[in-house]
Amino acid sequence: MAIGKRKESTEVKKKDGSMNKRVKVAKLPKKVDSFSPKKKKNTTSSGSSESDSMSQNDKKKDSSLNESEDEDFAGFGESASENDELESAESEAENDEESSSQKSNSKESHAQRKKLQKERKAMKPFADTSLKAKSLWDKLRQKTSIKAEERKTIIAELFDLIRTNVKQLVFKHDMSRVVQTCVKFGSKQQRETICAELAGSYVDLCKSPYGKYLAIKIFKYGTPKMKEVILGEMYGNVVKMIRHREAAYVVEDAFREFTNLQQQRALICEFYGPEFQVFKDRTQDIHIDKLLIDHPEKRPSIMQNLWKTIEGSIAKGSIGFTMVHRAMLEFINHADSNEAKELLNLTKELIYEFVHTRDGSQVAMKLFALANAKDRKVMLKSLRPYLIETAKDSYGHLVVVAALDCTDDTIMTGKLLQAEFEGELLKLSADKFARRILLYVLVGWEDARYFSKENRELLRSLDSLKAKTSKKDPIVRRNELKATIGPLLISLISKAAGDMIAESLASQVLVDALLYAPCEKEEAVDATLKAFDGNPEQDNHLIHQIHCSRALKTLVQNGHWSGAEKQVVKAEDDLKVASKLIVIIKKYLVEWASGDGAFVVVAVLEALSDSEKQEFLKILRKHKNQLNKSEFRGTKKLLEML
């Protein structure tokens, strides 16, 4: 074989077990130039002739050698490409062989690891119990596909498995849920048994990242006696638990959801000092007000310990806890000016964290009343991103009212309300709590129609606190706010009067905005009356809704009825609604006067001038026979006037 085509063959085993020839190409020598030895210099002629003859022979040999080399290297490019293909096939075969071996090795190692894991689990205590219990629990957690009787049977079987071993099992991450399910679906006797087995370990249970959920379940589904057992073990450890990462949530849930006032005070009293942590008997009602009256000498110690607990809880990130809010409220209720200032400095940038609870909102309101102008600005700035949510909260909206009622810088508060409320005014006016902020701006918090007696007393209690920090007259302050918010509400009414009057709560904002907003309101009044246009006999007419007829009657009277004064208290601006409404009523006079709109017609008659009234009465008398057929009280009142 020629040099360029010399090959060696070996055999390669395929994945399927068959043999495949692998071709190995030998290395080729470098191509050399034709051989031509150096000529020697000869002085004789014979030497030259000999050399000439030799050179001719050499040329012939060289030419023949070149021809043979050309023949040998013919097709060398083709064999090189074949070699490349064969080498790539060889590498692919090797890679496939390696990957298949790696896969088989990984499967084997995975199986070995799984086997070892099972063996290790089997060696653990209660391994069989845990396995059986989890199998039963898996059936129980399928809420839709299991019947009550079947659940009861499985619970009984599960309870027999874990009984006497609850304390050991409940601290395990997988078995904690199993025991929780037994407490949730078990009988009273089964719950009492589990509770009794855990006696003496409830503090550790609350500190466990898995066990804490069982403690909460016992609070939720247990009897009052079971709750007393857990609380009894908590007594003396409350301060430590409230600062513990896991136990703090159990104490908070117990305090907020599952305890009465006396039990709450029994938990809180541990914040007053170590001497209150010693006594396990908490049957007596311990309250800080009574303590400070009976033992005034203990005030410095109690206030210092309360402050340490508050400061430590905030440092731990527990400022959102209801229990901490109660401690803060008790602290600020009995704090002197320096102590109150310390609490203000600690919490003024975290005000949004505690406005959502009853106690926390009262703390925030008192802090706003005690703060100076600079601190109020910081507090409002921290509250601004959450202003909408706070306004809609059952307690938070009172904080916003208190902040507006204390802050003299009405330019700042007006811009704040305009920026945050303007795009949400329609929704806010229909919200149960947020609308009260708008109504405060329009009529003040003294109005009993919108603010309960408790809330009015709470806001009134701030007057003495803000006397030193707020200089403006409350009426002046509110009128300045009204000048900013009033036009926004009137603009909204002009665009969406129908939507507002149709909504019971929003209609209150609409009426008071039309009565008391200090701006041009004619367009808004026309838009409101237009919503009542049409035949009152239609079922969807607004007059059939009680709040709509009441709102329209108030606008016709140009003010609200005062029970104390026994008369309508007129607004300063006369809207002249009665004169405008006649145009709408005349189209369907009998329907208005003999149906749900009868009292509105009576109010129109009372509001008109004498000349307008006489003219309207003439028109009504023409339909007296039709009106006599009506049984509506308003129609009978109207007939008396006729």
Curated annotation (Swiss-Prot):
Which Gene Ontology terms describe the biological processes this protein takes part in?
A: regulation of translation; ribosomal large subunit biogenesis
Q: Where is this region: Disordered?
A: 1-124
Q: Which GO terms describe its cellular component?
A: nucleolus; nucleus
Positions with biased composition (Acidic residues): 81-99
User: Its domain of life?
Assistant: Eukaryota
**Pumilio repeats span which residues?**
160-196, 197-232, 233-269, 345-381, 382-418, 420-460
List compositional bias (Low complexity) regions by residue number: 43-55
Which keywords does this Swiss-Prot/TrEMBL entry list? Nucleus, Phosphoprotein, Repeat, Repressor, RNA-binding, Translation regulation
Q: What does this protein do?
A: RNA-binding protein involved in post-transcriptional regulation.
The protein's name is: Pumilio homology domain family member 6
Query: Gene encoding this polypeptide?
Result: puf6
